[in-house]
Amino acid sequence: MSETAYTPRLRAEYDQSIRSKLTEEFGYANVMQVPRLDKVVLNMGVGEAVNDRKKAEQAAADLGLIAGQKPIITFSRMAISTFKLRENQPIGCKVTLRKAKMYEFIDRLITVALPRVRDFRGLNPKSFDGRGNYSLGIKEHIIFPEIDFDKMGETWGMDITVCTTAKTDDEARALLTAFNFPFRQ
């Protein structure tokens, strides 16, 4: 019995059309020079977790539903008295997505989640870091269809960082635009 490997829609699109389009646009000599998606990091900072550890666990459970992968709870590295924060207290959670889960998450983000954001006018084109990575913030995590609005207690924001192998911001912008990221004009 032959086993067929599952290929996400965006990965197949990258292999079939996006890679050749970027090669023409930037004139790469080698296929390995063409920028590609490396990883996606989802981070949820939960300030209320300082007083109540269950908040960090609830946020981690929600992030696990969104990502389809178990997140890790992040802890403070030093004590800050103005925030009533001690060392090694839970302050949030994060998860790193790679390969198929990364492509599936980006597909859901672009096609389902971002259109559900209130007053969405496009992504900020200035949020590149100078090395080909893109970061965006989301104010409410309830835009993802995996979160049940009725059972949810609180809304948290989250940071999404898309890491690419691009050397410059222009290459990364061309790559993400080819993946249909809705940048503002």
Curated annotation (Swiss-Prot):
Cross-referenced Gene3D superfamilies: 3.30.1440.10
GO molecular function, one term: tRNA binding
One term under GO cellular component: ribosome
UniProt superkingdom: Bacteria
Single Gene Ontology BP annotation: translation
InterPro entries linked to this entry: Ribosomal_uL5, Ribosomal_uL5_bac-type, Ribosomal_uL5_C, Ribosomal_uL5_CS, Ribosomal_uL5_dom_sf, Ribosomal_uL5_N
Keywords: Ribonucleoprotein, Ribosomal protein, RNA-binding, rRNA-binding, tRNA-binding
UniProt xrefs under Pfam families: Ribosomal_L5, Ribosomal_L5_C
Free-text function comment from the UniProt entry: This is one of the proteins that bind and probably mediate the attachment of the 5S RNA into the large ribosomal subunit, where it forms part of the central protuberance. In the 70S ribosome it contacts protein S13 of the 30S subunit (bridge B1b), connecting the 2 subunits; this bridge is implicated in subunit movement. Contacts the P site tRNA; the 5S rRNA and some of its associated proteins might help stabilize positioning of ribosome-bound tRNAs.
Family stated for the protein in its record: Belongs to the universal ribosomal protein uL5 family.
HAMAP family documented for this protein: Ribosomal_uL5_B
NCBIfam families named in the record: PRK00010.1 (NF000585)
Assembly information from the UniProt record: Part of the 50S ribosomal subunit; part of the 5S rRNA/L5/L18/L25 subcomplex. Contacts the 5S rRNA and the P site tRNA. Forms a bridge to the 30S subunit in the 70S ribosome.
Name of the protein in question: Large ribosomal subunit protein uL5
Native organism: Rhodopseudomonas palustris (strain BisA53)
